Amino acid sequence: MTGSSIILRDGSLVVVRDYIDSDLDKIKDFVDSLSDATIQGRFMQVTPKEAVLRALIKNEWKTIIALRNDKIIAHGALYKGNEGFAEIGIIVSDNFQSMGLGTAMLGLLAEEAVRSGVKEIRSFVSPENYKMISALKSMGFAVESEAKPGAVMVRFSPSSLPEAIRNFDNRDSLSAINAVKFFLEPKSIAVIGASSDRTSIGGQLFFNLLESNFNGQIFPVNPNHEFVQGIRAYKSIRDIEYPVDVAFIVVPADVAIKVAEECGEKGVKGLVIITSGFSEIGDVGKKRQEQLSRICTKYGMRVIGPNCMGVVNNSDRVRLNGQFSPFKSIKGRISFLSQSGALGIAVFDITTRLGLGLSSFVSVGNKEDISGNDLIQYWENDEETDVILLYLESFGNPVKFSRIARRITKKKPIIAVKSGRYKAGFRATQSHTGALLATSDITVDALFKQSGIIRTDTLDEMFDVAVLLANQPVPKGNRVAILTNAGGAGILAADACEAHGLEVPDLKESTKEELRKILPDIASVKNPIDMTAGVQAEMYEKSLEILGRDDSIDSIIVIFILPVVLDPNDVAKSILRGVKKFNNSKTVVSVFMATKGMTEILREDGIRVPSFPFPEDAAIALARATEYGKWKYSPPKEIRKRESVDLEKVKAIISGAMRDGREWLTYDECSTILGIYNIPTVKTATFRDPKEAELKTAGWQGKVALKAYGPKIVHKSDVGAVELNVPVSKIKDSADAMLSGLRSRGFQVDYMVAQEMVPEGIEMIAGSSSDPLFGPLVVGGMGGKLVELLKDVSTRLAPIDMEDAAEMISELKTADVLRGYRGAKVADEEAYKEVLVNVSRLVSENPEILELDLNPVIVLEKGLGCKAVDFRIRVGSQGFKAPPFVAKSILNV
């Protein structure tokens, strides 16, 4: 059985799952524990507990329970009514009220109702139970209320679910922050497996904690010694007389399970499990980790690891060095998540050499529980973190990660390296869309792009971008001035800028005139500005002051190549004085004597100019930061409420095909579904026998397109399965000839279609293919016969909005074709964007759709819309199943 892990407001976990008959004894205990006031709030009157029990165990459409320590602490039910409405009822144990549990269960049930096509949700609430009404409103549901005798009936439409998801993510942030605080801001720590031997992991970790002067209590646990490194030791966690917030576990894996149980009994809030020997070693370790997970979930404990390096918080409020490396990090304003423990050791050394200090560091290991989703929400509000770095090897809940990251990257940059170049794992695909997306890293790119995350290919690039954003303002545009004392280096910088999407514009005439007045006659004041090798150090300051006043540039690359006559310290001071004069209004980076990082001579009085060893490195880092700036400074997106659609009819079509063992929907089924989602198609007649063609097209005028469909017919033009401009009067003869030709070559033809000819337009593609982890991926781009050859497409994870669709189109190399290229008519780009958004909604609401292919979509002249003239939909039970939006993850319970 599966369930959902829910984070309460205090950061602890509970499990929510379906109620089953064997839970009867648990539900009896739950009812017995309820106060009269709680019962009255749920049932509008004081009700005998026998009647409460009967009501709660009644077999309803959907009944869920929340558990902590194997005891039921909340109950929720969805009651299906007539005419498309459903009723929700929730009751929470007195001890767990006002912790966000009722709100989470409400979200779970509301999402289930939405998936089932419910058009209105109702709940009868006691007038005194204002918390229920407040919860609905706070989640963003458009709530209406109506007074009834002794009760208030509240109702809301699931169409406001997108806003509810966003609001719940904001509420969920507090829970995630409180959970991470267990680990990064503990008041007391136990180290189980602490040792006096500093060559052991437990010994070095305990030494690091002591040496960091941790601002709290530290308790070593070792059954074999009275003292560890001079501190009184305890034989067991249970022997410690004081509360323990976090326990570091550094014992063999088979012992760690027993220790975790003892920590739960002790009331420990979180475990940092350094120990290896879990899922990373195979089946035996996976079973061990599953056992560990059950124990921690039972007690509501949170976990970092197992198989991790530990955690660091360099804040003066905490002073926590809870990791086993002999290296120490310097204090700074960057926070780092590493999924690799070994990499973490190197990070301390690299960041110190680059002059990049760390605010905090977390090695998540196998990510049993605490993951990037939790940590980035903590760092979002951490006043000591300016830049977030992520080294990821896998994703747990990428859909939720994307939603959270979209919010955070508007405030702080997130820079990520995703190792392994994830292979999307699409099943054997048979459509144009599937072929474009199969076996690629495109899912990760799409996730990062639409979340505002800066993706770098290497750790070296990550630190280049980090040193820039940690020390300079985010660029407000892509216009770059290059100031150099060596012409060749300036040309290299200019080439690299333009190769990575930056513009090196001609400077304003007034700027060039000012530069001519101060620079040698042989200097070039074009952009790049070559001051020449013989220039004096003070020319850097004067030139930067002039460039700082030029509003036609956004960033400056300053290059210094060491000549014999200049002292680098003098040049550095000159650069700092120049930068100081324009007060962070522009982003400045330097290429300073092949120096990398944040060198001491380029920092003074709060002004810090990062240095790169080569012009290309500076340009690439600046380009990444500029792309992020475009995201950061873009206006917030409005969430449009979705119009209701006949979801039940769509589900009926899909389930009917699956029941019949069919993967591909028929043309008529596809056409019906597309119509329900307002995706325009052409006038069509379907037939199985050419004799039917004349009957089905009786009364049609002009010419038609004739097409054949079958399981192996994908690229119709390649096999003679499409003929255009067929006179209606000759449709039977043409259909006969096409059918005979296909069958003679071994193709099975299931049916044929005749379509009205669409006026001339631009052939585009719109489609989706489902990934088992990331969900449906939406694709848009140039379509037609050459789609797989050109591969000029853009992708996003569903769902998308109109702004996302606009960005997708802008990313196409051939975007200008839609915009009146070389005097052609401007196409209806808005209509095409609507198609992409509606495709996104269709596949999001129907995860059984494995592939959807609209190719081509003919985009007509502006104002005339567009038409999908060929389409295919493949369905299956193995489609993407996203965790509920209120859940941290799906659990096996």
Where are these regions (language model features)?
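Long, contiguous binding/interaction regions
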Residues: 1-175, 179-180
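Catalytic-core regions of core metabolic enzymes
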Residues: 159-893
